[in-house]
């Protein structure tokens, strides 16, 4: 099983943000913190698979993540708005948060 390399306390903060802002959304992590080739300064790459709510904005979600106490950079995008080739790469290895 693929693992997300994030401390439990940081994962809890992220899950709390997602639960409060977009409880119906599915959030995927991918990249070095999933593949295992990360270091302490690595960012966390994430995508929103689907907001399931037209009133939610990726910009607002980014701001909530940036305002959190998580001590590393995070990047989040909408999966459906990424190029097909990038979606294919993400689908090879990801973790649902």
Region annotations inferred by a language model:
Residues 1-26, 34-40, 49-97:
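Catalytic core of pol beta-like nucleotidyltransferases
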